[in-house]
Amino acid sequence: MNQIEPGVQYNYVYDEDEYMIQEEEWDRDLLLDPAWEKQQRKTFTAWCNSHLRKAGTQIENIEEDFRNGLKLMLLLEVISGERLPKPDRGKMRFHKIANVNKALDYIASKGVKLVSIGAEEIVDGNVKMTLGMIWTIILRFAIQDISVEETSAKEGLLLWCQRKTAPYRNVNIQNFHTSWKDGLGLCALIHRHRPDLIDYSKLNKDDPIGNINLAMEIAEKHLDIPKMLDAEDIVNTPKPDERAIMTYVSCFYHAFAGAEQAETAANRICKVLAVNQENERLMEEYERLASELLEWIRRTIPWLENRTPEKTMQAMQKKLEDFRDYRRKHKPPKVQEKCQLEINFNTLQTKLRISNRPAFMPSEGKMVSDIAGAWQRLEQAEKGYEEWLLNEIRRLERLEHLAEKFRQKASTHETWAYGKEQILLQKDYESASLTEVRALLRKHEAFESDLAAHQDRVEQIAAIAQELNELDYHDAVNVNDRCQKICDQWDRLGTLTQKRREALERMEKLLETIDQLHLEFAKRAAPFNNWMEGAMEDLQDMFIVHSIEEIQSLITAHEQFKATLPEADGERQSIMAIQNEVEKVIQSYNIRISSSNPYSTVTMDELRTKWDKVKQLVPIRDQSLQEELARQHANERLRRQFAAQANAIGPWIQNKMEEIARSSIQITGALEDQMNQLKQYEHNIINYKNNIDKLEGDHQLIQEALVFDNKHTNYTMEHIRVGWELLLTTIARTINEVETQILTRDAKGITQEQMNEFRASFNHFDRRKNGLMDHEDFRACLISMGYDLGEAEFARIMTLVDPNGQGTVTFQSFIDFMTRETADTDTAEQVIASFRILASDKPYILAEELRRELPPDQAQYCIKRMPAYSGPGSVPGALDYAAFSSALYGESDL
C-alpha cells in the first residue's frame, strides 16, 4: 500500500474577479457536443439532487424542472443557507420569469457576473443556458471557496487533487478531463482519506471502468456522494467533460474537508487529555518517590547513630567498609532520587501553571521542605558516625601497630632461627676435605657474628611483649607463649655454637697434611692431562687438503709427535706415585673423607684411559694419512689432463673469434667471398664440438673428485662454455649480417665498391670496434660524408637508423640509410607514371589493358584492389590507378 505524505495546511485566499474570468467566457459551442452535454446533464442533475433531497424533493429533467423557478430558488436556499424572496405561485409565464429572475438576482448579489443568461431562456427550457446557469451556481457555491496557496478556484481544486494523490503510483493529475480516465485518481483520493474503504495495491490500471465504478460505489455508500458520472462515458470519450469532472471531484473535497475538521477537533481533545494524564502521572510518581525516599531515610538514621565500639581492628574496618559502601553505592542513587524529585515537583508545578491547572499539593509530610529536613538529619547523623569511626580506628590502629610490630620481629627471628639447631648439630666436617672444613669454620664464624647481632632483636621482642601485657592486649596469652619459646631457643643456640667451633678446629689440623699431597698432584696432573687431550684432538682431527704438498706436511708432523711418546710415559708414572702416597696417608689415620683431589678434577682412572686412547689413535692416524696421499696423487693427474685440453681449446676459440671479427669488417673482396669464408669457419667450429664434449667429461670427473682449483691452467669450464656459446652466436650473427648486406646490395643496386666504401666509413668511426656507432660517432661520419646537419634533421635521421632509441647505429642500419640516400628507389609518382604509359596517357585504365600488359596474377591483383575512377572522362569499368599507387606507398587511406 502506498504511504501517504503528512497533511499540509493551506491558506485559502479568494478573489471574486479572478475566479470568474475564465468561466464567464465559457465556450457555448462546446455544449453542443452530445457526449459532453450528456455528461453535464447527468452530473449536474445528480449534484442538484444531492442538495434538493435535504429539502425532500428532487429533479428529473434539468431543463424542465427549473423552468418555473421554484426548485431553482429552493436549491439556492439549501446550498447557501439563506432565505430568498417569496416566490410567485402563479403558473403564468411572467410568474415563472419573475421567480427565475429572483434566483438570478440572488446569484448576482454574490458577486457572480451572469453573461448572456436570461430568465426567458431558462423558462423556455434552453438546455445550454440551463446547464451554464447550474455550472455558474456550482462554481460559486461548491468550488469558489476552494483556494490553495492563493490560486484560483479551479487551480486550487487541481492543486488539492495533485497533493493528495502525489504519493500514489500510476496517478498523475494534470487536468480535469484525461487525468481521471483510468479511475486511479478517484480511488487514490478515497484511499488517502479513508484507507479502510479501498485496497489500492490491488487496483489495475488496465481496468479503468472497474476502477471508476468502484470509486463511485464507495463514494455513494460511505461518503454520501451520489453517482454523477458514467464510467463508460468517461473512458470512451477522448476528452471527458471538464465541468462534470470538476463538479464530481469538488464533492470529494467538501466531504473530506469536514472529516479533517473533525479530526482536528479530536486531536485537540486528545492533546488536552494527554497533558492532564501526564500531570497525573507526575503527581503519582512524586508521591511514590517521596514515600520511598523518606522510608529509606527513616531506616538509615538509626544505623548511623549506633556508636557501639568493636574490640578488633578487623571489626572496625568492617564497619568502615560498610559505611564506605553506603557512601558509594546506596547514597548516590538516593541523592539522584532527591534531585529528580525536586525537578519533577518544579516541572509539574510549571506544567500545571501553563495549562491553567491548580497547583499540586503533596500529601502531608511529603512536601519538598519535609524531604529536605529529613535529608538534613541524615547528613548530620552521617557526619557524626564517620568521625566516631575514624577515632575508633585510630585508637585500634595504635594498639594493632604495636602487636604487628611484635609479630614482625618475632616472625623475623623465627625465620632466621628456623633450622639453625639442626645445622649446629650436624657432623658434616667428619667427611669433609680440608678446604671444606676451612669453609665450614669461616661459615661458623659468620654465624657467630650473626648470632650476636640478633641479641638486640630478642631483647626488643621481650620488651614489646611486656608492653602489650600492660596495655591489656586482647591476644596477650598468645604473645606471651610465643615470647617464651623464642627465649628458650636462644639459650640452646648459644650452647650448640660453642661445641661446633671446637670440633671444626680439630678437623682442620688433621686435613692439612693431606692437602699438600693433593696440591702437588694437581700441579702435575693438569698439564699432563691437557697434553693428552690435545694429542687426542690432533690425532682425530679431520683434515682437508687439496695438494700433495699439504698431505706430506701432515705426515711429517705426525712422525715428530710419535718421537715424544717415551718422555710422556715417564711423566705419567711420576704422577701415579703421588696419588698412591695420598691414599696411604688416609688409610693410616682412618680419615673418613673422599680420596678425590679438591684442587683437580683429573683422576688416575682418567689419566689411564686417555693414555690408552692416545696409543690406539697413533696407528689409525698413520693409515688415514697414507690413504689421503694416494688420493691427492690421483687428483693431480686429473688436473693435468684437464689443463692440457683447456689450454688448447681456449686459445683456439679466441683465435676463431678474432678471425671472424676481421672477416666481418674487411673492406676488400666480394661479399660472396666473405660469405664463403664465414661458412668455412662455421663448418670448422661445428667439427670442433667433439673437443668441447671431451673437456666436459674431464670436468665432470674433477667435480666428482671435489677438486676446486687447478694451478696448471687459467681456463675454467665456465670460461670455455661462455666462449664456445659466444663463438657460435658470433658466427651465426656475422653470417646473417653478410646475407643481409648481399640482399640490400642486390635490392638497392649497390656496387661492391660502394659497399666497401660504406664499410670503410663505418669501421673508421666505430671507435670501440664493437660493430656499433653511438650518436656522436654517427654524426661525425655523416659530416665527413658531406651532410650539413642541423639538430632537427639529425634527430629525424636518428629516428630512421635507431627507431627503438637504443642510442647506437648498427652497420645494417647505416647501409639502409645510405642506400636510401644514394639508390634509385621507387616512389608513388614513378608507379603512377608507369601506369599512365600502360593507359595510353589516360587518367584511368581498363581491366583489358591490365590483362594485356601485366602477368595474369598481377593483373588480377590490380583489378581486385583498384578503386573505380569517377573523374573527368570516366567510362564504364574505368579504374583509378593513381589512388591505387598512392595506397601502395601509404599516401592514401585505401
UniProtKB/Swiss-Prot annotation:
Residues engaged in binding Ca(2+) 2: D802, N804, T808
Organism: Homo sapiens (Human)
Spectrin repeats: 281-391, 401-506, 516-627, 637-740
Family affiliation: Belongs to the alpha-actinin family.
Organism lineage string: Eukaryota, Metazoa, Chordata, Craniata, Vertebrata
Tissue: Expressed in both skeletal and cardiac muscle.
GO molecular function: actin filament binding; calcium ion binding; channel activator activity; cytoskeletal protein binding; FATZ binding; identical protein binding; integrin binding; LIM domain binding
Alphabetized SMART domains for the sequence: CH, EFh, efhand_Ca_insen, SPEC
Modification after translation, per record: Ubiquitinated by FBXL22, leading to proteasomal degradation.
Compartment annotation: Cytoplasm, Myofibril, Sarcomere, Z line
Protein's UniProt name: Alpha-actinin-2
Cellular component aspect of the GO annotation: actin filament; cell junction; cell projection; cortical actin cytoskeleton; cytoskeleton; cytosol; dendritic spine; extracellular exosome
Positions of the UniProt region annotated as Actin-binding: 1-254
Gene assigned in the entry: ACTN2
Keywords noted in UniProt: Actin-binding, Calcium, Cardiomyopathy, Cytoplasm, Disease variant, Metal-binding, Phosphoprotein, Repeat, Ubl conjugation
Modified residues (Phosphothreonine): T237
Effect of A119T: In CMH23 and CMD1AA
Main location per the UniProt record: cytoplasm
Gene Ontology process terms (BP): actin cytoskeleton organization; actin filament uncapping; cardiac muscle cell development; cell adhesion; focal adhesion assembly; microspike assembly; muscle cell development; negative regulation of potassium ion transport
Domain EF-hand: 753-788, 789-824
SUPFAM superfamilies noted in UniProt: Calponin-homology domain, CH-domain, EF-hand, Spectrin repeat
Pfam families, per the entry: CH, EF-hand_7, EFhand_Ca_insen, Spectrin
